[in-house]
Swiss-Prot record:
GO molecular function, one term: actin filament binding
PROSITE patterns: HP
Similarity annotation: Belongs to the villin/gelsolin family.
Protein name: Villin-like protein
GO BP term, example: actin filament capping
Pfam families registered for this protein in UniProt: Gelsolin, VHP
Organism: Mus musculus
Length: 859
């Protein structure tokens, strides 16, 4: 059979399309089956980004997914299909190999709130896609923080552990059991998945219960024990995470792959840091990212045979290296590289990319349009400006490890031996916003830096936690910081005096002026010698008698105008303008004589549109672990998270309000991210810490849409639990019926399952039936260990009717469940009041029970 003739039609207007492969055919899955993967199958997944801001450079992503129990034939068919599809889709398609339980972040990002691994093969998959099943008994093991997965495991207490979450799914009853070591964020995300399963597969009809503390949920444990049997012994300990640290991901090696005769040659070319010029357009290259992921890069002039062999070569490399079979593989084409691939290199030149693909060369203009910054946050993000810098400014500096105010006349005059706090207050759509910059001089001490951070915490407390914080290193100030001082930022060598006074300009000093506008101009003191000059810029040479304003031959009008503005910072000296090549003798004498210096013109800096990356931060064994969220939106920011947004020029750490003690690690995590980055990023990159509900436009502008009121409606985990349980009476009804269970396992009936389950299954055969949990089984349990965790059988109580009927909660006898007051009646009183036996009553539909209880004073 010719696979090419059986390729499915591609709908370019659908973001996600999934096929299951079987017998040389690709069978499409309906959308409601997306995210469910059967372990004996292989799948093909195509993602075509629909939003320009959510793309990876405009490329599509083609994945083939391998179930852990898939046959060799199914795997081979999947490979053949994806290779033919990739050829049909063209060079703008990135090919991924995914293995069950070890999928890439890109793959997981398609499926919210998570992926589900199910037992079975093609028949089970197609049956699931066609019908809505209520006759279900399964246990799902739920794992993950940002990328959640649920795996079907054996119905046994042996499947449980203390650190994860398990969902006992009984069709119309779904019990989420939370391990005592599970975090609140894991519980919340698991509950979101549970609710999604209820709504997608059960039409919202199933009832959800949550076990957070077993001693407070004895009724629910009775149901679990009916299904799982008696639990003997303690639970298994938490399973260590298999997360890959950033340090391991930073270990990158590049290989050239080619054929010499009949031999395949794999030659190592370079290790970290890699440079883009190593990739030649007529070659094929393999990039090994610490054994965590293998990339195959194909030059646009490489042969069709080489392109077709890329995947098999990557798999062969994995086997030769002894890496796990589930190691991720990504095949990328020249010009369609993902952002993750590009950032493995020390730099990814748009100039080189533009020469190959001129149609992609669109420069983002850097002109500041102040009026649009508040209404167009995407512009604010690109220009890195929350406004034009005209707001209120307060400045402090660290002296003797204390925060001291700087006199306003010295604002913008910083010293390399000090640390400064710059508090900027501005209005955004009628609301007061704060941005606190922490500026660190190159010659400041470690003690000063600690005092700087402590002072920032104090200021944050004074402003009720509303400060966004920007950690700035001398010489790497962001545009908005420069705009605050209207282009007059001058950094002196040495330490500040009283009230932040600059060092006295008594000796000869040389200052380098760089910039053309108020938001990109800084003036830095440099060694006063001729070799510090460059022909492309402007310099001030200050002596005891005169201030020379030196214009290099390569500088242009905007630079000269800004320099004339900055020179006003140095009052009192006679000012003389000197052109390069026309310097007076005294100019050179002041610099200690002539010396060679760079004479090339400064090229204008280009600001390119880049694809930002969003990561969830966590720590494992003391190392930073990042989980990337692709195609991200505001909904990916969870109140329990610390998220890292990398825009290349800046790093943002977003702190959810419930992130807890990890908030203190945010800046350290940002520095570790830069330090362990495969591209060896500069540690001077500005790091901004922003808090939930106080995000500046320079952060929100990187998101497709942003709702400033979203956080006002955010729910706590406890509120999520309450809302997930449906009407307040629903869970009470279920637990009331649990007290009717007489749990008696029959060991001789293992194949059929627990007798209680047989009764329970019978009540679920029709999705139209109301929930009926009559799991009572007569007889004693001869094998029950009284020291085990199994609950004792509930014996019907007998209380006078007057102590139960029409009684408020506080007036009920101790131990009476207010949701099932009628249960404590004697059998004769129950028959007399309700006109039927308890057995007949509890076999009624729930709404009928509720109606009768309300009428007779038991609600």
């Amino acid at each position: 059979m010719d696979i090419n003739q059986d390729l499915p039609a591609i709908d370019s207007h659908r973001a996600l399309q999934i096929w299951i492969t079987e017998n040389l055919k690709m069978l499409p899955l309906p959308e409601r089956a997306h995210g469910n993967f059967f372990e004996e199958c292989c799948y093909v997944v195509l993602h075509v980004p629909q939003s320009p801001k959510a793309t990876q450079g405009g490329s599509s992503d083609l994945h083939y997914w391998i179930g852990k129990d898939a046959s060799a034939e199914a795997r081979e068919a999947a490979v053949s299909f994806v290779q033919c599809l990739q050829e049909d889709l063209g060079d703008q398609t990135v090919l991924h190999r995914e293995s069950q339980g070890h999928e890439s972040d890109c793959f997981h990002s398609y499926f919210h709130p998570g992926v589900i691994y199910r037992k079975g093969g093609r028949d089970s998959a197609l049956k699931f896609a066609e019908t809505n099943m209520y006759n279900v008994q399964r246990l799902l093991h739920i794992k993950g923080r940002k990328h959640v997965s649920a795996t079907e495991v054996a119905l046994s207490w042996n499947s449980f552990n203390k650190g994860d979450i398990f969902l006992l799914d009984l069709g119309k009853v779904m019990i989420q059991w939370n391990g005592p070591k599970a975090s609140i964020s894991e519980k919340a995300r698991a509950l979101t998945l549970t609710c999604n399963l209820r709504d997608r597969e059960r039409g919202g009809r199933a009832q959800i219960a949550v076990v957070d503390a077993e001693n407070e949920a004895t009724n629910l444990l009775r149901i679990m024990e009916a299904v799982l049997g008696c639990r003997s012994g303690s639970l298994c300990p938490s399973v260590p995470s298999n997360s890959v640290s950033q340090l391991q991901k930073a270990n990158v090696r590049l290989y050239h792959v080619c054929e010499k005769g009949t031999d395949l040659v794999v030659q190592e070319l370079a290790t970290r840091p890699l440079t883009q010029d190593l990739l030649q357009e007529d070659g094929c290259y393999l990039l090994d990212q610490g054994g965590f992921k293998i990339y195959m890069w194909q030059g646009r002039k490489s042969s069709p045979q080489e392109k077709k062999a890329a995947l098999s070569r990557a798999v062969g490399f994995i086997q030769a290296k002894g890496y796990p079979n589930y190691t991720n593989v990504e095949v990328v084409n020249d010009g369609a590289e993902s952002t993750a691939f590009q950032q493995l290199f020390w730099s990814w030149s748009k100039e080189l990319d533009r020469k190959k693909h001129p149609e992609k060369s669109k420069l983002v203009q850097g002109n500041l349009e102040v009026g649009k910054l508040h209404t167009q946050p995407e512009l604010a993000a690109q220009l890195r400006m929350v406004d034009d810098g005209s707001g209120k400014v307060e400045v402090w500096y660290i002296q003797d490890l204390q925060r001291q105010p700087v006199h306003p006349k010295y604002y913008g005059q910083l010293c390399s031996g000090n640390c400064y706090l710059v508090l900027y207050t501005y209005q955004k759509l009628g609301c007061v916003q704060y941005l606190l910059y922490l500026w660190q001089g190159h010659q400041s001490t470690v003690e000063d830096t600690k005092a700087l951070n402590c002072s920032a915490e104090e200021l944050d407390l004074m402003h009720q936690g509303a400060l966004a914080q920007g950690h700035v290193t001398m010489g790497s100030e962001p545009p908005h910081f420069l705009a605050i001082f209207q282009g007059r930022l001058v950094v002196f060598q040495g330490n500040a005096g009283n009230k932040g006074e600059r060092p006295p300009v008594s000796d000869t000093r040389l200052f380098h002026v760089q910039g053309t506008e108020s938001h990109n101009t800084r003036t830095m003191e440099v060694p006063a010698r001729a070799s510090s000059l460059t022909s492309g810029d402007v310099f001030f040479l200050i002596t005891s008698h005169v201030c020379y304003l030196w214009f290099g031959k390569g500088c242009h009008g905007d630079q000269r105008e800004m320099a004339r503005t900055v020179v006003s910072v140095f009052p009192g000296n006679n000012k003389e303008t000197v052109l390069e090549g026309q310097e007076p003798l005294y100019f050179w004498e002041a610099l200690g004589g002539r010396a060679p210096y760079p004479s090339n013109k400064r090229l204008p800096e280009e600001v390119w549109s880049i694809q930002p990356r969003l990561f969830e931060c966590s720590s494992h064994a003391g190392c930073l672990v990042l989980t990337e969220v692709l195609f991200f939106g505001q909904e990916d920011l969870d109140k329990y998270d610390i998220m890292l947004l990398d825009t290349c020029q800046e790093i943002f750490l977003w702190l959810g309000e419930a992130a807890g003690e990890w908030k203190k690690e945010a800046v350290a995590w940002g520095l570790e991210y830069l330090r362990t980055h495969p591209a060896e990023r500069s540690l001077a990159t500005p790091i901004f810490v922003v808090k939930q509900g106080h995000e500046p436009a320079t952060f929100t502008g990187w998101f497709v849409t942003w709702d400033p009121y979203k956080w006002m409606n955010s729910q706590s985990y406890e509120e999520m639990v309450g809302n997930s349980l449906g009407p307040g009476s629903a869970i009470s009804e279920m637990t009331a019926e649990v007290h009717n269970f007489q749990l008696t396992p029959r060991l001789s009936d293992n194949k059929a399952g627990h007798p209680a389950l047989q009764a329970f299954k019978g009540s679920q055969d029709s999705p139209e039936n109301e929930l009926g949990l009559d799991l009572r089984v007569d007889g004693a349990n001869p094998s029950m260990n009284h020291t085990s965790s199994c609950s004792d059988s509930m014996v019907n109580g007998s209380l006078p009717r007057e102590r139960l009927m029409h009684q408020a909660l506080e007036d009920l006898p101790p131990g009476v469940d207010p949701a099932r007051k009628e249960f404590y009646l004697s059998d004769s009183d129950f028959q007399d009041i309700f006109g039927k036996s308890k057995e007949e009553f509890y076999s009624m539909a729930k709404w009928k029970q509720q109606q009768a209880k309300k009428k007779l004073g038991f609600f």
